[in-house]
């Protein structure tokens, strides 16, 4: 289930403050964050946010289509290496 509409969207305060400072100064810097739970607001559009995936920070460029989604959706935490291939030698 999603978040209740009466509660509204959530974003960490420290992330919002960093975005506001960059918007007032018209700067474009990469913002490192561990907050995968934060919702993307329209003020985030045009910025690059480096979201932590458990090993490293993955740079995510925010576009208008991403508004309303969570930051963690764009930084996958698991790497899929594929299923084991057929071993042709053991079939003989």
From Swiss-Prot:
Pfam families: Ribosomal_S19
Keyword Ribonucleoprotein tagged: yes
A single BP term in Gene Ontology: translation
Identification of the protein by name: Small ribosomal subunit protein uS19
Function: Protein S19 forms a complex with S13 that binds strongly to the 16S ribosomal RNA.
Classification via HAMAP family: Ribosomal_uS19
One function term, GO molecular function aspect: rRNA binding
Keyword terms of this UniProt record: Ribonucleoprotein, Ribosomal protein, RNA-binding, rRNA-binding
Family: Belongs to the universal ribosomal protein uS19 family.
GO cellular component: cytoplasm; small ribosomal subunit
Paired cysteines (S-S): none
